[in-house]
């Protein structure tokens, strides 16, 4: 099905090989997990399999890639795309329409299917994937996880022989990841070949047949799933991989008194009875909580629950319909919130503007000494990339750059929307250390996240949002109940 022989590749403008002498064979019907640190070559390997290398991404290419009987260099990209369907790390980059129905059948429409067949296929796909609630929606109004579901649906509709999934769970909530795992099982039973590049590997332990671990553009380990599951935990950590079982991750115990200002001694950021409306519909209803500098508050919940809307409201980007937000008892207007806060967005590509990592750190920040930038970049393993263009970075590297800028900006209120999306274990821990350092400096720190591993090990408290309301609060060892609580909403 897929045969790679002595493949080496480097992107134009880079000195090192992004892939180095890769040889492997993946038979029909096998489910393969690609794992390894951010920047190890996983995404580049997926681009080789789907034909984007060498047809779209230019660079120095050598070796031979046979995909479903076709030589990838000689075959037309349209022929390859009939055989290989890809869900990209950032689903926004593969959308061509403004509404969900058109997007799901876009590939089939390009193949010339008549309207009645398009409608029939649309209904079957949405029923199979249980996404009827996403029919006839604007792409621009979807949450990150909902966009990921639509991207998957558009690939599923085309029924390719090979599925390539690049970080498919990165923006998904706990329920959606469970649904994704069932869907992967379903297409596996159909005899499809599946290649999944992932950092969150826990949901794939009973699905994958094989694990390929990459390091510095090379295949360092190639093993069957049983061998991988039997590896000692110490070896998994030395490989810088995330947990294989969420139950093995135990919560950090942080005692929070009813008066959080006594516990942490910092400034108090209070949200009272916040309601946000989209047209005549309430997206958030009567949201109230308070946090003190020194605390790290996590806000989690299902895709579309209103988490990103809440983040945008807290930092003044979205207008509340009712309620108030204050800092040390003083009301904060939208303008004041924008001046005093910094938000790391879910799609960090929206807030990267310059032509180098170093310049990005300086943007809009006066009199910032070079040693301060170097210290933060080193702490986030970005110092060697400081001359690179931000848009040439991997998804995880872009995420860390946005976190670096948040540290350097000097704002009082810091809001992170999915800061660990696309991050490996080492990068997640580095981001966690940086966020803890901000909390230690008595900054107000609020993290919007689906990452249960991150919540348990880094955050002081977690608020569960459902249907636009806060339905549960957990802190300390109670965070170990998080998966169980998420199952109930």
Swiss-Prot record:
Residues 2-241, 269-487 form the ABC transporter domain. Its EC number is 7.-.-.-. Keywords: ATP-binding, Cell inner membrane, Cell membrane, Membrane, Nucleotide-binding, Repeat, Translocase, Transport. GO terms for molecular function: ATP binding; ATP hydrolysis activity; ATPase-coupled transmembrane transporter activity. It is a peripheral membrane protein. One of its GO terms (cellular component) is ATP-binding cassette (ABC) transporter complex. Probably part of an ABC transporter complex. Responsible for energy coupling to the transport system. Belongs to the ABC transporter superfamily. This is Putative ABC transporter ATP-binding protein TDE_0282. It comes from Treponema denticola (strain ATCC 35405 / DSM 14222 / CIP 103919 / JCM 8153 / KCTC 15104). The lineage of its organism: Bacteria, Pseudomonadati, Spirochaetota, Spirochaetia, Spirochaetales.
């Amino acid at each position: 099905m897929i045969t790679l022989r002595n493949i080496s590749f480097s992107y134009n403008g880079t000195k090192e090989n992004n892939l180095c002498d890769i040889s492997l064979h993946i038979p029909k019907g096998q489910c393969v997990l690609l794992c390894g640190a951010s920047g190890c070559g996983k995404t580049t390997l997926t681009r080789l399999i789907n034909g984007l290398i060498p047809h779209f991404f230019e660079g120095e290419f050598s070796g031979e890639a046979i995909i479903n009987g076709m030589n990838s260099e000689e075959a037309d990209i349209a022929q390859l795309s009939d055989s290989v369907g890809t869900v990209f790390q950032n689903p926004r980059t593969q959308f061509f329409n403004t509404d969900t129905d058109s997007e799901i059948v876009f590939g089939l429409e390009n193949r010339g299917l008549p309207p009645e067949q398009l409608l029939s296929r649309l209904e079957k796909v949405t029923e199979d994937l249980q996404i009827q609630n996403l029919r006839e929606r604007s792409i621009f109004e979807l949450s990150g996880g909902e966009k990921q579901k639509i991207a998957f649906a558009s690939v599923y509709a085309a029924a390719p022989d090979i599925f390539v999934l690049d970080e498919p769970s990165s923006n998904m909530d706990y329920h959606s990841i469970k649904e994704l795992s069932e869907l992967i099982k379903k297409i596996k039973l159909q005899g499809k070949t599946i290649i999944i590049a992932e950092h969150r590997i826990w949901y794939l332990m009973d699905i994958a047949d094989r694990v390929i671990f990459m390091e510095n553009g090379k295949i360092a380990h190639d093993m069957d799933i049983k061998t991988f599951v039997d590896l000692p935990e110490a070896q998994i950590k030395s490989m810088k991989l995330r947990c294989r079982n969420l139950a093995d991750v135990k919560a950090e115990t942080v005692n929070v008194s009813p008066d959080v200002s006594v516990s942490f001694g910092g400034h108090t950021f209070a949200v009272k009875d916040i309601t946000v409306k989209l047209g005549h519909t309430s997206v958030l209803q009567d949201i109230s909580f308070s946090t003190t500098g020194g605390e790290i508050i996590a806000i989690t919940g299902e895709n579309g629950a209103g988490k990103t809307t809440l983040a945008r409201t807290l930092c003044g980007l979205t207008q509340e319909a009712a309620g108030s937000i204050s800092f040390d008892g003083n009301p904060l207007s939208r303008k004041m919130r924008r001046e005093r806060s910094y938000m790391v967005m879910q799609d960090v590509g929206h807030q990267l503007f310059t032509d180098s990592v170093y310049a990005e750190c300086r943007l809009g920040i006066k009199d910032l000494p070079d040693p301060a930038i170097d210290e933060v970049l080193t702490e986030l393993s970005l110092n060697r990339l400081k001359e690179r263009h931000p848009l040439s970075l991997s998804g995880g590297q872009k995420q860390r750059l946005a976190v670096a800028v948040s540290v350097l900006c000097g704002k009082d209120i810091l809001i992170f929307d999915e800061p660990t999306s696309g991050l490996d274990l080492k990068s997640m821990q580095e981001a966690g250390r940086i966020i803890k350092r901000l909390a230690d400096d008595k900054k107000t720190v609020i993290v919007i996240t689906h990452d249960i591993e991150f919540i348990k090990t880094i955050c002081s408290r977690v608020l569960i949002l459902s249907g636009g309301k806060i339905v549960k609060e957990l802190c300390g060892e109670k965070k170990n109940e998080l998966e169980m609580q998420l199952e109930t909403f």
